[in-house]
């Protein structure tokens, strides 16, 4: 039974996205269907949590919109995701950045920058 589940998850997994870690600032293009029309909606914010593995992996992205904090839980393997772009890599010393919820203003999105060395 476990082999069957792993086989299905492997066939559904998407590998076309970059590595995403808590603290990274990402821009996610989501497909939104309204009636018969389909359009792309951008959601840009800081990854405060990632959870699960394989087909059930999700990330929580937080942004400040007109002074109000907005969080969205996004399944990484969803077919409604068009693209994920990492805008900035953040240096976080924790796996969950829930302390950002208590901050207001500019400090609510402030995470130290991380230098990224790309492997050839």
Swiss-Prot record:
GO terms for cellular component: cytosolic large ribosomal subunit. Pfam families: Ribosomal_L19 (PF01245). InterPro entries: Ribosomal_bL19, Ribosomal_bL19_CS, Ribosomal_bL19_sf, Translation_prot_SH3-like_sf. Keywords: Ribonucleoprotein, Ribosomal protein. Gene3D superfamilies: 2.30.30.790. GO terms for molecular function: structural constituent of ribosome. It comes from the Bacteria. This protein is located at the 30S-50S ribosomal subunit interface and may play a role in the structure and function of the aminoacyl-tRNA binding site. Belongs to the bacterial ribosomal protein bL19 family. This is Large ribosomal subunit protein bL19. The gene is rplS.
